[in-house]
Amino acid sequence: MRPPPFNPEIRRALRIDVSAALLFAVFASVTTPFIGLILRRELGATPLQLSVMSAAGGACLLLSLAWARALGGRPPLPYLVWPSFVARGLFLLAPLASSAWSLVSLVVAANVFGAAAGPAQAAVVERLYPRAARGRALGLVRMAGAALGIGLALAAGQLFERVDYRVIFPGAAVLGMAASLRQRHLPVPAAAGAGEPTVGGLRQAWAAVRDDDVFRRLLVASFLFGAGCWIQTPAHPLLLVDVLHVSAAQVGVFAATAAAATLVGSAWWGGLVDRRSSLDALWMMYLVGAATPAICALAWDPWVLVASSVTDALVGVGLDLVWMVVVIDIAGPARAAQYVAIGATLAGVRGILGPLLGGLLIGALGVRAVYLMAVALMTAAAWLVVREPARRAVVYSGSW
């Protein structure tokens, strides 16, 4: 059955959201895929420095409950726009990052402000897009960015072979900041009724987890899957540079392939969460995620990583889209920001421990052992979601 067309309010929001996504795609395409490569190849970052950067990025998420509490019942849009504006603007300082530690510090600072926008993003999405169209709307936004990212990634790979990152990153920062400013025009409705309640602190978060059996079980699965993701982070630059000797041009090809996969995945995941239980989409996403470390563990040639780029991109857009819809479905409008903050806080815990554990595994058993451990953790997460009793229900906000 063909889904109904978007109403005028959704179309208006999509015009703004898509234009912001296009600007952000330029920023992301010439920064994120190349940070690890620059740190290892050009600045000689050690496994310890790579682990510290990843763990610090996770530690930033520990502040999620504080950010959600600061949001409270206030309009969420400013809490989305301005932290992301600062996070992207920090890349203007790239010309000052002449050592591994200085670039690591810049990335960590950007992660602090980026994490601050997480709870507000969930609140904006919940208000902006009705549940029946939420998956398709978010998928369309991601598709727009991915379509532009295909060509950008290929060009960026060649650009980094010719131009210093200290020149490229500030230019990207300007466009990233413009994307944040564009989001200021999103027509976010006011909260229904008296507005969203105060999120509270750790005690209220513990009460929410204790009282919601479904959410608690999904947090366990999410923790296993996320741990599998995080332990890989210090291994990726080492696999690229030391094991497979990947060039910047090849990284550009991988990123372009990932953008193409994101284009397809955005449409598929978005349609799936609107047609079926969002938990069905979640376990499928977790299984696809387990394929990425499996491919990396077996990779014998740089071009094998094209396949892992596809699966990693499918999971990346799935984590962004499917998990947000799952949490909003479970929480309902009043608790969406709190539930997102709880999930992000636990992501911070595994984000600290995962990279450090990954670094220890690399030292003891080698790079590929990390990927085998990740496969086991991520497969276990998928199994837990498959066994979830609530999975068979078609989930809509407030249905539990």
Where in this protein do the model-derived segments appear?
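Helix-to-loop junctions at the C-terminal end of transmembrane segments
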Residues: 63-76, 160, 264-277, 362
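Helix-loop junctions at membrane interfaces in 12-TM secondary transporters
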Residues: 94-107, 297-309
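Transmembrane alpha-helix termini and helix-breaking/packing motifs in multi-pass membrane transporters
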Residues: 37, 41, 69, 73, ...
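C-terminal membrane-cytosol helix-exit motif in multi-pass small-molecule transporters
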Residues: 173-192, 381-389
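Intracellular juxtamembrane helix-capping segments at the cytosolic ends
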Residues: 116-129, 318-332
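Structural signature of the two symmetry-related core transmembrane helices
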Residues: 78-93, 170-173, 280-295, 372-375
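Juxtamembrane intracellular "pre-TM" segments in multi-pass secondary transporters
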Residues: 1-11, 188-220, 400
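Helix-loop boundary and gating motifs at the non-cytosolic
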Residues: 2-62, 214-254
